[in-house]
A protein has these predicted regions:
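Membrane-embedded catalytic cores of phosphoryl/pyrophosphoryl-handling enzymes
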Residues: 55, 99-208
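Short helix-capping/hinge motifs at transmembrane helix termini and TM-loop junctions
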Residues: 43, 59-62, 92-93, 134, ...
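Basic/polar, acidic-poor N-terminal "presequence/leader" segments
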Residues: 44-58
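Membrane-helix interface segments
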Residues: 28-31, 65-70, 98-99, 133-139
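Alpha-helical transmembrane segments in multi-pass membrane proteins
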Residues: 73-77, 81, 85, 89, ...
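Residue-level signal for the membrane-embedded core of alpha-helical transmembrane segments
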Residues: 45-49, 75, 79, 120
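Interfacial segments of alpha-helical transmembrane regions
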Residues: 55-83
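N-terminal transmembrane-helix/juxtamembrane module of multi-pass inner/ER membrane proteins
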Residues: 1-47, 86-111, 207
Length: 208
């Protein structure tokens, strides 16, 4: 069976809820462009990985070991959450919204719907990026997560249960990543050692 085959479908109440959201929000000025912008930012968690990378580099330049761990966890969490959502999608194989009354406002890389990878990675990243930035707990998720979840409905590419489950899965992934800072510290130490070893093997300009 292909990983893109679809077996599950959403019920009528989910379809009605999605149509209701689009009826209220989709035609408001600026909503669709903003939703598409969020879609591109969260695609494959690339925007969140980039943000974590910038923070990690800045912490490295400052020599702040604790901050490096936090920013590394943000990147790891975003990647891990995205991967977890893909794994669940391939088990559930729910088809994306396809009712003719639903307006689809953006292309998607997959026909699979449950859970929303955007919701999963954004929730994990928001929790972990907020922690790395030193913001109050819940502050960044409160700003980032609701708009991302709503945007997936406005664009007609997910059902309400897709985004709700994705957010829950993302929170679980964030908690798993931060359970033991020592694992991340060891990974960073290994990466640093590997980098030094590689640099040590590269001949200097005078040796070439």
């Amino acid at each position: 069976m292909s990983s893109e085959s679809t077996d599950a479908t959403a019920g009528g109440r989910e379809v009605d809820a999605l149509i209701a959201v689009q009826r209220v929000l989709a035609d408001r000025p600026g909503v669709l462009p903003a939703a598409r912008g969020l879609s591109h930012l969260g695609e494959h968690a690339l925007g969140w990985i980039a943000a974590a990378g910038v923070g990690y580099v800045a912490a490295t330049v400052r020599g702040d070991a604790d901050a490096r761990i936090r920013w590394a966890q943000a990147g790891i969490g975003a990647v891990g959450a995205h991967a977890a959502s893909i794994a669940v999608k391939r088990v559930v194989r729910r088809r994306r919204p396809h009712d003719p009354r639903i307006r689809v406002g953006v292309g998607t890389p997959s026909r699979l719907s449950f859970p929303s990878s955007h919701a999963t990675s954004t929730t994990a990243a928001a929790i972990l990026l907020g922690r790395a930035s030193g913001l109050p707990a819940g502050a960044l998720p409160a700003v980032l997560v609701p708009p991302m979840l709503t945007s997936r409905l406005v664009l007609g590419v997910h059902y309400p249960s897709d985004v709700a489950t994705g957010a829950l899965l993302g929170a679980v992934c964030a908690a798993a990543v931060t359970r033991d800072d020592r694992l991340t510290a060891r990974a960073i130490a290994w990466s640093d050692a590997a980098g030094r070893a590689v640099r040590g093997r590269v001949p200097s300009r005078g040796e070439r």
